[in-house]
Amino acid sequence: MASRGVVGLFLLSALPLLCLELRRGIPSLGIKDLILLSGRIFLLLALLTLVISVTTSWFNSLKPSQGHLKEGEKENEKRRRLVRERQQEAQGEKASRYIENVLKPQQEMKLKKLEERFYQMTGETWKLTAGHRLLEGDEDSEFENSSQASFETINGEAARRQNLPKFSTEISPAARPLLRKEVPDLPEEPSETAEEVVTVALRCPNGRVLRRRFFKSWNSQVLLDWMMKVGYHKSLYRLSTSFPRRALEVEGGSSLEDIGITVDTVLNVEEKEQSSQ
């Protein structure tokens, strides 16, 4: 395309010269003048041919170098792209490690502190303790095995807090029948398929959760008997509902249904305040 443009340029520049010569030679145009004009034209064509050949060869020599430059640019662009990809991967790995090692622990610690503060404000710090759930078959055996030891240790600790006389850990044989009489036996637990039955979960201060089924028509005093049987004396501890949080009013002549326990309920064992003694 460049060689054709050069040829056209030379032809356009030669046309005015030819027209000028023809005008000059028209009045006295002879054979000699025609020969000279023809020679000039051939000389001009020869010069044009030489210029075209030189220009064509020069352009052909430039093409390989331009192709080589393009290949070099492609290689450089490819290398730059690979470097950018590696840098992005390295930055992504750094960001993921920062999130895993720094941000997540900070967020978990912040959530834990907020949870502790929330439970401290609501008075439910027992939720922060690690408890375990007993199977139904193990509950009765757990009651029998731990009632005596829990009764002595927990009541002794509560007595120290409230400046009450500490119960003696050594019980004489003569006093043991009195203790058994003070902690009455619970009625037999009804089956799951029985009607008018509710399940009560007893959440202890040490985080332990015990469950038992009761008939709605039973006397509400059975809840206090159950609390004493698992080791929390009614003179030092009381029962309260979870939500809304209020003390459970257990009266001698009221049934479970009368005090509002008509569905499955969770009750908390709480230590009585000293002012209430």
Swiss-Prot record:
Q: Where in the cell is it found?
A: Endoplasmic reticulum membrane
Q: Lumenal topology: which positions?
A: 23-33
Q: Which InterPro entries match?
A: Ubiquitin-like_domsf (IPR029071), UBX_dom (IPR001012), UBX_domain-protein (IPR050730), UBXN8 (IPR017247)
In this protein, which residues make up the domain named UBX?
A: 193-269
Positions of transmembrane segments: 2-22, 34-54
Q: Where is the composition biased (Basic and acidic residues)?
A: 68-89
Might you report a single GO cellular component term? Answer: endoplasmic reticulum membrane
Region feature Disordered, mapped onto this chain: 64-89
Please provide the Gene Ontology terms (biological process) for this protein.
ERAD pathway
Q: Which residues lie on this side of the membrane: Cytoplasmic?
A: 1, 55-277
Which stretch is the leader sequence? none
Query: What domain of life does the UniProt record list for this protein's source?
Result: Eukaryota
- Enumerate the CDD domains for this protein: UBX_UBXN8
For membrane topology, the record states: Multi-pass membrane protein
Q: Which UniProt keywords apply?
A: Endoplasmic reticulum, Membrane, Transmembrane, Transmembrane helix
Which tissues express it?
Highly expressed in gonads. In testis, expressed in post-meiotic round spermatids, while in ovaries it is expressed in granulosa cells.
PROSITE patterns linked to this entry:
UBX
Q: Which PANTHER family match?
A: FAS-ASSOCIATED PROTEIN, UBX DOMAIN-CONTAINING PROTEIN 8
Question: What is the stated purpose of this protein?
Answer: Involved in endoplasmic reticulum-associated degradation (ERAD) for misfolded lumenal proteins, possibly by tethering VCP to the endoplasmic reticulum membrane. May play a role in reproduction.
Q: How does it assemble?
A: Interacts with SYVN1 and VCP.
Protein name in the entry: UBX domain-containing protein 8
Species of the source: Mus musculus (Mouse)
